[in-house]
Curated annotation (Swiss-Prot):
Pfam families: OTCace (PF00185), OTCace_N (PF02729)
InterPro entries referenced in this protein's UniProt entry, alphabetically: Asp/Orn_carbamoyltranf_P-bd, Asp/Orn_carbamoylTrfase, Asp/Orn_carbamoylTrfase_sf, Asp_carbamoyltransf, Asp_carbamoyltransf_Asp/Orn-bd
Record's function text: Catalyzes the condensation of carbamoyl phosphate and aspartate to form carbamoyl aspartate and inorganic phosphate, the committed step in the de novo pyrimidine nucleotide biosynthesis pathway.
EC number: 2.1.3.2
Name recorded for this polypeptide: Aspartate carbamoyltransferase catalytic subunit
Annotated carbamoyl phosphate binding sites: 58-59, 108, 136, 139, 264-265
Natural source organism: Syntrophotalea carbinolica (strain DSM 2380 / NBRC 103641 / GraBd1) (Pelobacter carbinolicus)
GO molecular function, a single term: amino acid binding
Family: Belongs to the aspartate/ornithine carbamoyltransferase superfamily. ATCase family.
UniProt entry keywords in alphabetical sequence: Pyrimidine biosynthesis, Transferase
Assembly: Heterododecamer (2C3:3R2) of six catalytic PyrB chains organized as two trimers (C3), and six regulatory PyrI chains organized as three dimers (R2).
Pathway(s) it belongs to: Pyrimidine metabolism; UMP biosynthesis via de novo pathway; (S)-dihydroorotate from bicarbonate: step 2/3
Keyword Mitochondrion appears in the UniProt entry: no
Catalysis performed (reactions): carbamoyl phosphate + L-aspartate = N-carbamoyl-L-aspartate + phosphate + H(+)
């Protein structure tokens, strides 16, 4: 099956077949990270610029490693080192980047729709590494890959996503992706962190974490994004932990073989206890590991890759 997308802007625009192709391609690339020499010549001669206007550790580093393992020339630009701090507009930034003739731009931005804006105005491929509270497609894809590896399938699973749904681009991308692949999605959080009309995304909404977690195959905890919310949304971290934190007792309500996920960074003792975060059901580091393979797959596919078997030799 051919991948017919020049850009990766969101999961909402993808089909189930697109998602499956990305996951299958990522599986094939996982072997590269296990080699003594972790590099293949797949994207030799290609230039990838990682433009991050928001702080990031996992996503930026993961994309950088992914590009280098594919032999691409990778360049990193952060907000603090860009001309944006001097007043340059996003449109002017786009024009200047295009003048340098990159092949792929990986962008994270605090404004929803910024990667779309770039894609509409430039010839290079754009990969959305997170835009505001809109979407974070590569995170959802690595989450799906982790679930598929641990459970063997996604269709028919019950996935509970707990936390700050309003500000979570991870939640939105996961809801889109899980629905397309046939999972049942549950959302839970304080009323102030559940956006109006969230049911329209195709998820059940719960007020109590105990109800949301009960019988779940996967429990995904979300970070409290204090940088995006007002003080009135969260009375105290202690109160949040009491009513919505994931503890060993609450995990007992899920299925015995349930897995625990978190996109990171974690606030230990707030959304998740250390006992759960370090426990046997946690697959958080598996998510991080799978992030490199998924991002290798995205860079490869938007570059027009067709026969992975040939490129990975």
């Amino acid at each position: 099956m051919a991948f017919n997308h020049k850009h990766i802007l969101g999961i909402e625009q993808m089909s189930a077949e697109d998602i499956t192709l990305i996951l299958d391609t990522a599986e094939s690339f996982k072997d590269v990270s296990l080699r003594s020499i972790k590099k293949v010549p797949t994207l030799r001669g290609k230039t990838v610029i990682n433009v991050f206007f928001e702080a990031s550790t996992r996503t930026r580093t993961s994309f950088e490693i992914a590009g280098k393992r594919l032999s691409a020339d990778t360049v990193n630009i952060s907000a603090s080192t860009s001309a944006v701090v001097k007043g340059e507009t996003l449109e002017d930034t786009a024009k200047n980047l295009e003048a340098m003739k990159p092949d792929i731009i990986v962008m994270r931005h605090s404004c929803s729709g910024a990667p779309h804006y770039l894609a509409e105005r430039c010839d290079f491929s754009v990969i959305n590494a997170g835009d505001g509270a809109h979407e974070h497609p590569s995170q959802a894809l690595l989450d799906l890959l982790t679930i598929r590896q641990k459970k063997g399938h996604i269709e028919g699973l019950t996935v509970a996503i707990i936390g700050d749904i309003t500000h979570s681009r991870v939640a939105r991308s996961n809801v889109y992706a899980l629905n397309k692949l046939g999972a049942e999605v549950r959302l839970c959080g304080p009323g102030t962190m559940l956006p109006p009309g969230i049911e329209r995304l195709g998820a059940q909404v719960f007020d109590r974490i105990d109800d949301a977690v009960s019988g779940a195959d996967v429990v995904m905890m979300l970070r409290i994004q204090q940088e995006r919310q007002g003080k009135t949304m969260l009375p105290s971290l202690r109160e949040y932990s009491m009513f919505y934190g994931l503890t060993p007792d609450r995990m007992k309500l899920a299925k015995p073989d349930a897995i625990v996920m978190h996109p990171g960074p974690m606030n230990r003792g707030v959304e998740i206890s250390s006992a759960v975060a370090d426990g046997p059901q946690n697959v958080i580091l598996d998510q991080v590991e799978n992030g490199v393979a998924v991002r290798m797959a995205l860079l490869y596919l938007v570059s027009g890759g067709e026969k992975l078997e040939d490129s990975a030799q």
